[in-house]
Regions:
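Extended amphipathic alpha-helical interaction segments
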Residues: 21-92
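A structural signal for well-ordered alpha-helices, especially hydrophobic packing surfaces
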Residues: 9, 33-36, 61-68, 98, ...
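Early exported N-terminus immediately downstream of N-terminal targeting peptides
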Residues: 1-35
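Long amphipathic all-alpha helical oligomerization modules
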Residues: 72-136
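Generic serine detector
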Residues: 3-4, 13, 23, 38, ...
Length: 136
């Protein structure tokens, strides 16, 4: 009986959420890179703000790696003693976690873009005001 708990049912490996979790990880990596690059190129943020953003995104990527590592343990034969139902429950939980991580990354990216635009707009207004008032 216990040896059967180490065997992986092929339907578990082909469970759609397994591929979706991997897909989320790829999307998060791409979005995190784009976000950090945009953050740096915006020229609206201090070195400290950029470092903070990098730390947050690095922590997010580390969490993603942990989730995918756990997924691989769940779907690799002889790694864990679990029933099929237990494996599906764990996969569903990992899927929800990856959805949350992607949503967080997406919202962070949008918020950073909005903040950069707000700061740029503010700088334009300051420059316009200086020009109108003859201030250098």
């Amino acid at each position: 009986f216990f040896s059967s708990l180490k065997t992986i049912n092929p339907t578990i490996s082909r469970y759609a959420k397994v591929a979706d979790i991997i897909s989320y990880q790829v999307r998060i990596i791409k979005l995190a890179r784009q976000t950090l690059q945009s953050f740096r190129e915006a020229n609206q943020f201090s070195v400290e703000e950029i470092e903070y953003c990098k730390k947050v995104l690095d922590a997010l990527l580390d969490d993603c790696i942990q989730s995918v590592t756990e997924l691989l343990e769940i779907i690799t034969p002889d790694k864990l003693q679990m029933t099929d139902d237990e494996r599906l429950v764990r996969i569903d939980k990992l899927y929800g976690d990856m959805q949350d991580k992607f949503t967080f990354c997406n919202v962070m990216s949008e918020d950073i873009g909005l903040l950069a635009l707000q700061r740029l707009s503010e700088q334009i207004e300051i420059n316009r005001s200086k020009l109108i008032n003859g201030i250098k």
